Amino acid sequence: MTRLDFRNLLHEIWLKSDTDFSGVGIIVCDTPICLPIMNLRGDSPAISGTTAEVLSHLSRTESKYHDGFHIINQMGLITHIAQYFSPPIVLNVNIDRSRPIGGRFTAAIFGSAIPGVLMTGIVSEGHGLSIFENGHETLFETLK
């Protein structure tokens, strides 16, 4: 998955979202066993539809799976849903604090520095769309 492919996926999730969109955090990784994650729900929903359709639906506030990060592999297939993601703090990360940031943003930027993580990305109404690679924000878009 290229950065452009990932950007397009994140944008499509946002476009397909409804008024109760809670935002989304996604980790692109083929080796999730190495990630500091924990399943927040203990179960997983039935997955039917494209990755963008499924993640857009799960990112509604009415979905019990809207919290945490979802994991996809480099082929864009969902491997894990609603994972608590607790990456270690990366001290030398440059964070643009002129925009509103929160826990999802910091987990995504720190988590992108974990070996085996190709990229992380977030989308939210208040923040926009961001992609992170190797502890750096490599793409930011305001959504309208």
What are these regions (language model features)?
Residues 1-144:
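Divalent-cation
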